[in-house]
């Protein structure tokens, strides 16, 4: 692992982080993805269980298909919970829903999707 590429201190990373809802569509180098996944598996977790796996998708066609399914599922959940069928139904001032809707709309354009797959302790491996 090439940790020299991580130029930011831990404190700076923790205290300056922010949510990113607008992402560049640029491809992410495999080396960067590997570095992030290596950091993820080194992070503390409950009971020190390292039972997870990662599924990394960088194929544009698959991401576009996933993005469409994600958006469809997002709106289905809003319809079930609130009766909303589109942006016009979101009450004014519901900024969290507007931001989440933006992510649902943009999911098709992200450069990479990482699925974290877990297995409960004593459970069978499955997706």
Regions found by a protein language model. Give the residues of each.
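Residues within well-ordered alpha-helical secondary structure of globular protein domains
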Residues: 16, 39-42, 69-72
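Glycine/small-residue-rich phosphate/adenosyl-binding loop
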Residues: 50, 56-127
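Specificity-determining recognition surfaces
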Residues: 1-38, 50
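Glycine-rich phosphate/pyrophosphate-binding beta-alpha loops
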Residues: 43-49
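Short, low-complexity, polar/charged sequence segments that are solvent-exposed and flexible
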Residues: 33, 42, 73-77
């Amino acid at each position: 692992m090439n940790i020299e590429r991580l130029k930011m201190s831990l404190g700076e990373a923790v205290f300056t982080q922010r949510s990113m809802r607008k992402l560049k569509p640029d491809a992410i180098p495999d080396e960067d993805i590997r570095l992030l996944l290596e950091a993820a598996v080194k992070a503390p977790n409950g009971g020190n269980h390292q039972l997870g796996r990662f599924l990394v998708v960088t194929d544009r066609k698959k991401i576009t298909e996933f993005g469409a399914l994600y958006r469809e599922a997002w709106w289905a959940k809003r319809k079930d919970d609130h009766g909303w069928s589109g942006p016009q139904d979101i009450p004014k001032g519901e900024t969290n829903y507007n931001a989440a809707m933006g992510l649902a709309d943009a999911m098709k354009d992200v450069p990479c999707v990482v699925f974290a797959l877990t297995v409960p302790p004593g459970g069978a491996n499955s997706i």
